[in-house]
Swiss-Prot record:
Organism: Methanobacterium ivanovii
Lineage of producing organism: Archaea, Methanobacteriati, Methanobacteriota, Methanomada group, Methanobacteria
Record's keyword annotation contains Transcription regulation: yes
Name of the protein in question: Nitrogen fixation nifHD region GlnB-like protein 2
Function of the molecule: Could be involved in the regulation of nitrogen fixation.
GO cellular component, one term: cytosol
Gene name in the database record: glnBB
Length: 122
């Protein structure tokens, strides 16, 4: 099994979920996150102003951009399809398109039924 973690633009989350659902991958976790790439900020994108004074002083010149992070666990043989599908929806060719991480998952357990392994994620 693989965990696919994708950090994408907020305006791409709905289409990404639709495509993954159409492929049979509807189980996922989605979060609103803030972050930045090596460019520190992207001109034209909204930045997140930190309200807490202590954190703001530590922030310095760094500005954080709102993003969405989705995470889903899929069988090994489906990882490439999921990654390619996420890329197809989210690639604009511009800085800020996002990142996709693919991580190995040793095991999974469905709490309600005690199913484990791929049975717990399918």
């Amino acid at each position: 099994m693989k965990e696919i973690i994708a950090i994408i633009r907020p305006n791409k989350i709905n289409r990404t979920k639709e495509v993954l659902d159409a492929l049979g991958f509807s189980s996922m976790t989605a979060n609103a996150v803030f972050g930045r790439g090596r460019q520190k900020a992207i001109v034209g994108e909204v930045t997140f102003a930190i309200q807490n004074k202590d954190l703001r002083e530590e922030e310095g010149s760094m500005r954080y951009i709102p993003k969405r992070m989705i995470s889903l666990v899929v069988p090994d043989e489906d990882a490439s399809l999921v990654v390619e599908s996420i890329m197809k929806v989210n690639k604009t060719g511009q800085i800020g398109d996002g990142k996709i991480f693919v991580c190995p998952i040793e095991d999974a357990v469905r709490v309600r039924t005690k199913e484990s392994g791929e049975d717990a994620i399918l």
